[in-house]
Structure formats: structure tokens, C-alpha cells
UniProtKB/Swiss-Prot annotation:
Pfam families listed in its UniProt record: HTH_WhiA (PF02650), LAGLIDADG_WhiA (PF14527), WhiA_N (PF10298)
Keywords: Cell cycle, Cell division, DNA-binding
NCBIfam families cross-referenced by the UniProt entry: DNA_bind_WhiA
Protein name: Probable cell division protein WhiA
Gene name in the database record: whiA
């Protein structure tokens, strides 16, 4: 488990909710994303396997406090196929009562495959709790980078879609993704990752994430301009800044008339002013070639310049001034 992931989990286990619904939502999510429910000889057993001992202790404590059901903690040491120890919360008595109380079976006894309906249609705090539980169970947060982001490994497609729905209720865009046979939910946008960390209750980690992200985004420009002998880099930086300024002007001119696919390319150019076209393509979701990015930006500027001409107002080139490019 990476340092940031561990930091998030250490912070989340200290989050306490006064709402019983939210506590149950978090527990249901943990069972769904880290648990297995098995029946043998007519007896149901739940095992929740976690990578953090403190999380396992929290889960056992919540089960006891919410439902007066005892849970046993079992530590699994490192193995040849697994270097890190695992911690299992085992419920052998009243397991059926537990899964019914958290909503993982319907009143008629049918198993719920994704998340319980009361979470999907519940309050914002329920959605936050579901994400908190999912991250404690199977979440990872990587350092800001080209493929950075927050992800949760999911037991099935239905669970991933349910988590995507919870993110949508929080105003965030998450995407289901299948990698090497494992279903995942991924959030790549840096601002969205920060917002979700705050929503879950990891406010300190959110500050660390934002600082790391800001340093990383500032570094490419500093690296490029440090070598003033490299005229190509300077020309590229000037062109990127000029294009970003023109795109901003274009978006103002076009207003709501901007097609979505052109708006996406324009927003990337504005948000990452010093990035190369190739870097913008990698930041797009889904990713694009640099030629595709360039083509969309070119069409956006052409549309805006044509509309400006029709309206009798200055076109996008008016914002490209010597003052704008003085630092390059």
C-alpha cells in the first residue's frame, strides 16, 4: 500500500458519523468491497479481508456497536503470493442477520449484487459513507502524475456501477474500468480527487494531494525555461501560452455554442497552459493523439474567429500581446 493510500485510510478511520444510516452505509460498502459471504453446512460466514489492521479493528467495533454481533480478528502473515500481511474480520455467528441489517439481501432473501438500494437512493452523507467504506476496503491513491488518481478495486461490475452512481450524487465524475480481469472505479481528474478526499473526510490528505499536484504542474514549465539555450522549448512554451489565451477568448465569444468535444480540448489547453499537445492528449479522457487535440483546438479557434467577424468584434488573436509573452 502506497504512502498516500495509507495516509487516507489512517485519516478515514478517525471519521465518526452521528448518523446511524451513514455508519451502516459505510459498513455495507466495506463488506461488499472487501468481504466474502459463504455458506457451509447451512451456516453463513462472512470474512472481510483488509490490508490495514486499524481498519479491521474499526469494522469489528462497528459491527459490535451497531448490531451487538461479535466479530473475530484473524491476522494473515506474508505469503509467497502476497508480501504484505492481511487482516480478516470473521463473523460466524448471526452473519445472516448482519447482511440483512446492512441491506445486502432483500426482504425476500435475494442477494443484492451491487450496493443496497437505501444507499443508492439515500442521502448525500450515505453516498459519502459508501465511498469512505469502499476506499477503506479496496482503495488506492497514487501521487499526482500522468496516470495518477484514485481508484477502488471492485468485486463485480454491478458494484463498480453503484459506486460510480454514488460519485455522481456527489457531483463527481468517476468511471468504471476493467484492468487484467479486475473491475475498478477510477477518478483521474486532480480536482475531483481532491473533492472526493474532502467528501470522505480526509481533509489533511487533500491538502497534501493539492500541494503535490501544484508542484508537479509547476515543474514542467520551470524545467523548460531553465535551459534558455534550447530555443525550441522556448518557442513551444510561447506557442502554448498564446494558444491558451486564444482559447479562453474563443470560449467567451462562442458561449454556449461550443460543441462538447471542442470544449473539452479547449478546457485542457486553458487548464494546462504550458503542457505540450502530446501531454494534453494523455490528460484527456479518453486519451487522444496530439494531432486530434491540435485539430480540435484549431476548429474551436476558427469557429470563434468566424463568429467574431460576423459580430464585428476583435477575434481571438487580440489577446496575444507582447506583455503576455514577456516571460518567454
Amino acid at each position: 500500500m502506497g504512502a498516500l493510500s495509507a495516509q487516507v485510510k489512517d485519516e478515514l478511520i478517525k471519521v465518526s458519523s452521528t448518523k446511524q444510516r451513514s455508519r451502516i452505509a459505510e459498513l455495507a460498502s466495506i463488506i461488499r468491497f472487501a468481504g466474502s459471504i459463504d455458506s457451509a453446512l447451512g451456516k453463513t460466514v462472512i470474512e472481510i479481508e483488509l490490508d490495514n489492521e486499524a481498519v479491521a479493528i474499526r469494522v469489528a467495533k462497528e459491527i459490535e456497536e451497531l448490531f451487538a454481533i461479535s466479530a473475530k480478528l484473524v491476522d494473515l502473515g506474508p505469503m509467497a503470493t502476497r508480501r504484505t500481511p492481511r487482516h480478516v474480520v470473521r463473523i460466524a455467528e448471526d452473519a445472516e442477520t448482519l447482511i440483512r441489517r446492512v441491506g445486502l439481501v432483500t426482504r425476500s432473501g435475494h442477494a443484492v449484487v451491487g450496493l443496497p438500494p437505501q444507499i443508492i437512493s439515500g442521502s448525500i452523507s450515505d453516498a459519502e459513507a459508501a465511498w469512505r467504506g469502499a476506499f477503506l476496503a479496496a482503495g488506492q491513491l497514487s501521487d499526482p502524475g500522468r496516470t495518477s488518481g484514485l481508484e477502488v478495486a471492485c468485486p463485480c461490475l454491478e458494484a463498480s456501477l453503484a459506486l460510480v452512481g454514488c460519485a455522481r450524487r456527489l457531483g463527481l465524475s468517476a468511471k468504471p474500468k476493467e484492468t487484467r480481469g479486475v473491475e475498478k472505479v477510477v477518478i483521474r481528474d486532480g480536482e475531483a480527487v481532491g473533492a472526493l478526499l474532502s467528501r470522505m473526510g480526509a481533509h489533511k490528505t487533500r491538502l497534501v494531494w493539492d500541494q503535490k499536484r501544484a508542484r508537479r504542474e509547476a515543474r514542467p514549465l520551470g524545467n523548460r525555461l531553465a535551459n534558455f539555450d534550447d530555443a525550441n522549448l522556448r518557442r513551444s512554451a510561447r506557442a502554448a501560452v498564446a494558444a491558451a489565451a486564444r482559447v479562453e477568448r474563443a470560449m467567451t465569444i462562442l458561449g454556449d455554442d461550443v460543441p462538447d468535444h471542442l470544449a473539452q480540448a479547449g478546457q485542457l489547453r486553458v487548464q494546462h497552459r504550458q503542457a505540450s499537445l502530446e501531454e494534453l492528449g494523455r490528460l484527456a479522457d479518453p486519451q487522444m493523439t496530439k494531432d486530434a487535440v491540435a485539430g480540435r483546438i484549431r476548429r474551436l479557434l476558427h469557429m470563434a474567429d468566424k463568429k467574431a467577424s460576423d459580430m464585428g468584434i476583435p477575434d481571438t488573436s487580440v489577446v496575444v500581446t507582447e506583455e503576455l509573452l514577456d516571460d518567454f
